[in-house]
Design a protein with these regions (language model features):
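Short, structured coil segments at secondary-structure junctions
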Residues: 2-6
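Alpha-helix capping and helix-loop boundary segments enriched in small/acidic/polar residues
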Residues: 7-11, 336-337
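Active-site loops and adjacent core secondary-structure elements that bind or stabilize anionic groups
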Residues: 11-232, 236, 257, 266
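C-terminal accessory domains/tails appended to large, multi-domain proteins
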Residues: 189-369
């Protein structure tokens, strides 16, 4: 191999900051790398001793689709089209922060607010929480950061595992190819695909992108001051703001822009628990594992012009404190993981995406093991 250093698999982006800080630490790095390597050895051994799950053929999986009550689909949006937001109020977004992932980013495990009184990590968590809120006070009062976002809604229809969007103003169609679960299910459980939540006879789908801008001058100052703690703290808070913005914008979509839940009144705790109608799956996450759908989404939203968010050649977003995804409004829409797929679906997906097999394999590598 060309690289022989440590490789750490981070399941949740919110934990990346904490992992990176431990890898950079003179006092923690060696123990962390050794412990992780030992854990990975156990994982490999456990995987080798475990039988592979049974896959259905793609035709069998499609025959076992999720049969949604399409008569319950969301009404057309009250405000269709694309809506840009140049500077969402950070003070409002502060109230929508989910603090549990923030603590996990620092390798402090426990749910907020209980973690603040935890017998083991409570004291450390309280100090970190106080520092975070002190920095939040400055971020908001001194306008360190800017929250930019965009949301859009388009008429569409399901066509198999694809969702075809009709761009009326351009007289063109845009196809969103989604993947279907192929692992054999227990009785009465469907092999789900996001397209199952869309009516073939006509429906609506939405999309969004939000980003937090303005970190660079403060990170540069922290670097000059050799203040690693503040550097990591600001990055972690920017990530929390991005997620809070995604949550708040989705709420605005449900109650006002799309308006299929105008009477919704939920606490932040209820929002965090997703006790509302609709989902916002993101490209690169379990229900929609292909990151390469981001350019299609960004084109629909004109996201770069409307938010300043750009995509790298490997579909990562910049600034890194950013979130994007699709909106599904059907009341039965739910999150799920596509998990492992077969060669037949890979070939079908490559055809639907218009790419060669090698490219499709690269995009979907985690789902082929």
């Amino acid at each position: 191999p060309a690289y022989e250093g440590p490789v750490i698999h981070v399941l949740d982006a919110s934990r990346a900051v904490g992992v990176a800080s431990r890898l950079l630490s003179d006092t923690q790095r060696d123990e962390f790398v050794e412990t992780t390597a030992a854990e990975y050895t156990k994982v490999r051994a456990a995987r080798e001793g475990k039988g592979q799950s049974v896959l259905l053929s793609l035709d069998e999986a499609r025959a076992n689709f999720f049969d949604a009550y399409l008569s319950d689909k969301a009404a057309p949006p009250l405000q269709p089209g694309v809506h840009a937001f140049d500077d969402w109020d950070l003070a409002e977004l502060r109230d929508y922060i989910d603090w549990t992932p923030f603590f996990r980013a620092w390798e402090l495990h426990g749910n907020y607010p209980a973690i603040l009184t935890d017998d083991v990590v409570g004291e450390t968590a309280r100090q970190l929480f106080d520092d975070a809120n002190a920095m939040l006070d400055r971020i908001i009062a001194e306008k360190w950061l800017v929250a930019k976002g965009v949301a859009g809604f388009w008429p569409c229809a399901r066509d198999g595992d694809d969702v075809t969007i009709h761009r009326v103003n351009r007289e063109e169609h845009v196809v969103l190819p989604f993947l279907r679960q192929q692992v054999k299910k227990s009785r009465d459980r469907a092999n789900m695909c996001l397209a199952d939540f869309i009516d073939p006879a006509g429906d609506w789908i939405g999309g969004f992108a939000v980003g937090i801008h303005g970190l660079e001058p403060y990170l540069a100052r922290f670097k000059d001051d050799k203040d690693d703690y503040s550097d990591i703290l600001l990055k972690a808070l920017a990530d929390r703001f991005a997620e809070a913005f995604a949550e708040r914008l989705h709420q605005h979509v449900r109650t006002d822009l799309w308006g299929y839940a105008p009477q919704e009144q939920l606490t932040n705790e209820a929002l965090i628990k997703e006790q509302y109608r609709g989902i916002r799956p993101a490209p690169g996450y379990p229900a929609c594992p292909d990151h390469s759908l981001k350019p299609i989404l960004f084109d629909l939203l004109d996201a770069e012009a409307n938010t300043g968010i750009t995509l790298t050649e490997n579909f990562a977003m910049y600034p890194t404190a950013a979130v994007s995804g699709f909106y599904f409004g059907h009341p039965e829409a739910e999150y799920f993981g596509v998990a492992r797929i077969g060669r037949d679906q890979l070939e079908d997906y490559a055809r639907r995406r218009g790419v060669d097999m090698a490219t499709a394999e690269r995009w979907l590598r985690p789902n082929l093991d």
